[in-house]
UniProtKB/Swiss-Prot annotation:
Belongs to the protein kinase superfamily. CAMK Ser/Thr protein kinase family. This is G2-specific protein kinase nim-1. Residues 7-290 form the Protein kinase domain. ATP binds at residues 13-21, 36. Residues 495-693, 747-858 are annotated as: Disordered. The keyword Kinase applies. It catalyses: L-seryl-[protein] + ATP = O-phospho-L-seryl-[protein] + ADP + H(+); L-threonyl-[protein] + ATP = O-phospho-L-threonyl-[protein] + ADP + H(+). Its EC number is 2.7.11.1. Residues 548-572, 580-598, 650-661, 760-780 have a biased composition (Polar residues). GO terms for cellular component: cytoplasm; mitotic spindle pole body; nucleus. InterPro entries: Kinase-like_dom_sf (IPR011009), NEK_Ser/Thr_kinase_NIMA (IPR051131), Prot_kinase_dom (IPR000719), Ser/Thr_kinase_AS (IPR008271). Residues 526-535 have a biased composition (Acidic residues).
Length: 858
């Protein structure tokens, strides 16, 4: 890459005798330079030597008031020489003078002094080869330092071509002395003998062909300052000769009045004809005004330098600020990245640590859980090991010694408890003739509380009791629970058992999983109901709903109706079903009573004293429903006592021999008599009566009251406060079948026939009549049909034989005015009424009904 390619050509700024001056820009740093293009193809040898001397001098001169020289470029192909020098933006001093002439203005004196002082300083550097001394503190005078001695062997440079066109001005009006093409380098003691300059600025010694000395440049300096002030040269003529003559005379015109005399005097000193009288550059520098100008120039230079430095520093500061901001941004980004990296790393570490601790804690809790489960399993296994066991038939065995001693804090039965865990459900075919002699089968009876639901294994620990379907209570009552209605609000508190263990009713896991033990078929016939004081416990069944405030399956918001639990048993339960040791004892006792009933008179004392003479429960409440069975039983006991004192036992034997005794769960059957004997017994009834005894017909109806259940309306009325016994009897009498009335009345006639001779006439008191309350239309039709059937049968059988009644008389025997009510060989009779939804048929099996002919023959 050539030197010319490193610069960018901008414009042409002038031309000279040797070439063209152009303005260029350096591409490296953008610096503006001045290129002087000189073609030495047509130069003579002397001119080539002068050109060589110029760039040699410029290369050694380095001063602020001298045009700077950078380098040269020699183009051999075109024989051109390019000199790159400092660029002066304001042109030269000759253009300034032309502008003043053009504008008809005078230059300011301060400007003139500034140009003068700078030219003196530049000439001082050329004449003495050193820079002039600084003003410093010697503003008022340079002293001995004003005239320095040139260094030995130094070079003295004579410009020899000072003119306004060779004085250049910078942007700040700084003077730059240039164009040293005609300069001559000579020793300090040498003098130049040739003059090659402009004739308007040549000194008198040059005109006189004398030698050229340093004082010649001072003359040229005076001519330039005078032309700047007067806008014309000091010496001017039309011909060369006249010009030389005027120069030798040395007379000049005064300066315009705008300038000071000091300036004119200084110019006159410089234009003295005698060179020895001219001041040198050192003397000129010592002038007060020059010192001030120099000092001012120094201040300006200093301010410019300071401003430049400030700009440089500001630029540097801005660069540093930008770099600092970039560094801060980079630092923040790096820190954010490091923080994010550290955060991620610590989050990962924390997550791992948390996971480890969580896993450790989970493992610890799992171990604790397994240990706890193992401990509870062992405890349950130990408890199951000493809990109740079940045999192959599903019967519950005896509890362990620990569980047997635990007694529940409340009674779980709604009607009391029997001898065993389950009541006897056997019929007459299951009764054993042999009397059980094992005393261990009979356990102590536990006092009952009324209207409590049964819960099995109540004495077992709470941890081992689990929930069963028996403890489930539906949200809405189903029809199956109407059989156990308890409509009185006063019975609600004692109806529900406080369930402390809302779990499975079985404390231990049964050994047998036979589901047939709990699937008990429902009885289609009416179930017996007796006195509530002698009621027995219900058979535990999973289908029954436990009314308990602590039942977890009960609905809190919906309260079911109070229930009156009735005793229901099935007569078709297999023999090998759920049985207990107490059941066997009950069967043997029942058969023993039946075996002797046909041979001995019927008495109240011998009929199951263990069942009759039970102590009343201390926690039992008295029912507000009148107990008809209890009244009949007390009247029967009085009649039996009367007959045992003075009468014969034949009538009682006759009556009791015809009674078919059934255990609990079967239908009751009284003496089976034909219609004729019944009518005859009614006609021959003794009229002798006790004041406290009710009529015979009422007793029969009262005894038969336990056959059929009450209607829903009557139950509501009974729970609300009860009805009179007479109204109940009169209303219930129409609901009985004819055969049921006949059997009960026949037994009463046979027992009272022996007293007909002593009393003279039989008195049949009429039962108190009350207006019946029909329930439905079908119920009224049924009453009318039953009444018609009763009348027709009574009239058709009124002529029957009286053999049955004749057998009841005896001499010396006290007659029993009231018939003896059948004594039911049961352990407990309940007063609770059966469900009205269970219809009891009046048809009896043929095996239980004895024909009338057989009765008369016996």
């Amino acid at each position: 890459m050539s030197e010319s390619d490193k610069y960018e050509l901008l414009e042409k700024i002038g031309h000279g005798s040797f070439g063209i001056i152009r303005k260029v820009r350096r591409k490296a740093d953008g610096m503006i330079l001045c290129r002087k293009e000189i073609s030495y193809l047509k130069m003579s040898q002397k001119e080539r030597e002068q050109l060589h001397a110029e760039f040699s001098i410029l290369s050694t001169l380095r001063h602020p008031n001298i045009v700077g020289y950078y380098h040269r470029e020699h183009l051999k192909a075109t024989q051109d020489l390019h000199l790159y020098m400092e660029y002066c933006g304001n042109g030269d001093l000759g253009r300034v003078i032309r502008n003043l002439i053009k504008n008809n203005q005078y230059a300011e004196e301060s400007f003139v002094w500034s140009i003068f002082s700078q030219l003196v300083t530049a000439l001082y550097r050329c004449h003495y080869g050193v820079d002039p001394p600084e003003v410093g503190k010697t503003v008022l005078g340079l002293g001995s330092t004003a005239r320095p001695k040139p260094p030995s062997g130094g070079m003295t440079i004579l410009h020899r071509d000072l003119k306004p066109e060779n004085v250049f001005l910078g942007e700040d009006n700084s003077v730059k002395l240039g164009d040293f093409g005609l300069s001559k380098v000579m020793q300090s003691h040498d003098f130049a003998s040739t003059y090659v300059g402009t004739p308007f600025y040549m000194s008198p010694e040059i005109c006189a062909a004398e030698k050229y000395t340093l004082k010649s440049d001072i003359w040229s300096l005076g001519c330039i300052i005078y032309e700047l002030c007067a806008r014309e040269p000091p010496f001017n003529a039309k011909t060369h000769y006249q010009l030389v003559q005027k120069i030798k005379e040395g007379k000049i015109a005064p300066l315009p009045s705008v300038y000071s005399g000091e300036l004119f005097a200084t110019i006159k000193d410089c234009l003295r004809v005698n060179p020895d009288r001219r001041p040198d550059t050192a003397t000129l520098l010592n002038l007060p005004i020059v010192r001030l100008m120099r000092k001012e120039k120094e201040v300006v230079e200093f301010s410019r330098t300071l401003r430049t430095k400030e700009e440089t520093l500001n630029k540097r500061i801005r660069e540093l600020d930008s770099k600092l901001s970039a560094l801060e941004t980079e630092k923040s980004s790096i820190r954010a990245e490091i923080d994010a990296s550290l955060r991620r790393e610590w989050e990962v570490k924390a997550r791992l640590e948390i996971d480890r601790l969580v896993a450790q804690e989970i493992e610890s809790l799992q171990q604790k859980f397994e240990q706890e489960v193992q401990a509870r399993v062992e405890a349950e296994l130990q408890r199951h090991g000493r809990g109740p066991m079940f045999n192959s038939h599903g019967q519950q065995g005896s509890f362990s010694s620990t569980a047997a001693t635990l007694v529940s804090d409340y009674n779980l039965s709604s009607v009391g408890s029997g001898d065993g865990d389950f009541p006897s459900t056997t019929d007459i075919t299951d009764i054993s003739i042999a009397e059980s002699t094992d005393g261990s089968d009979i356990t102590k009876k536990i006092p009952r509380t009324p209207f409590h639901r049964a819960q099995t294994y109540s004495s077992a620990p709470a941890e081992s009791v689990l929930g069963t379907p028996m403890d489930i209570e539906m949200a809405s009552p189903s029809p199956i629970t109407i059989a156990s209605l308890s409509l009185s609000p006063r019975r609600m508190a004692l109806t529900k058992a406080p369930t402390t263990n809302p779990r499975m009713i079985f404390g231990e896991e049964p050994t047998s999983t036979d589901k047939s033990n709990w699937e008990v078929p429902r009885e289609t016939e009416m179930i017996d109901s007796g006195d509530e004081s002698e009621a027995e416990a219900l058979v535990p069944s999973p289908k029954r709903i436990t009314k308990s405030s602590k039942n977890p399956f009960s609905t809190v918001t919906t309260r079911s109706r109070p229930s009156l639990n009735s005793q229901q048993n099935s007569n078709v339960l297999p023999i090998h079903g759920l049985r207990s040791k107490q059941t066997l004892a009950t069967r043997s006792k029942t058969v023993s009573g039946v075996s002797s009933i046909g041979q001995h008179p019927l008495r109240s004392a011998p009929s199951a004293p263990s069942l009759r003479d039970r102590k009343p429960s201390p926690t039992r409440r008295l029912s507000r429903i009148p107990s008809v069975t209890g009244v009949g039983r007390r009247l029967s006991a009085n009649n039996i006592n009367n007959s045992s004192n003075g009468g014969s036992d034949a009538p009682s034997s006759t009556v009791t021999s015809n009674i078919t005794v059934r255990t609990r769960g079967l239908k009751r059957m009284s003496s089976t008599c034909d219609e004729s004997s019944f009518s005859q017994q009614q006609n021959n009834q003794p009229q002798q009566s006790l004041p406290q005894a009710p009529p015979l017909k009422k007793i029969g109806l009262m005894a038969a009251k336990n056959i059929r259940g009450s209607s829903l309306v009557e139950l509501h009325q009974a729970r609300a406060g009860g009805r009179p016994i007479s109204a109940i009897i009169s209303n219930e009498a129409k609901l009985r079948a004819f055969k049921e009335h006949a059997t009960i009345a026949a037994s009463a006639v046979d027992s009272s026939s022996s007293s007909s001779s002593s009393s003279g006439q039989s008195q049949l008191p009429t039962r108190p009549r009350s207006q019946p309350q029909p329930i439905t239309a079908n119920f009224e039709q049924q009453q009318q049909q039953q009444q018609s059937n009763t009348n027709s049968i009574s009239s058709s059988n009124s002529a029957g034989s009286g053999s049955a009644t004749g057998t009841g008389t005896g001499a010396g025997t006290k007659s029993m005015p009231w018939p003896v009510a059948p004594v039911w060989n049961r352990e407990v009779e309940t007063e609770e009424m059966p469900s009205p939804f269970i219809v009891k048929t009046s048809k009896r099996p043929a095996s239980f009904v004895r024909p009338a002919s057989n009765l008369s023959q016996s």
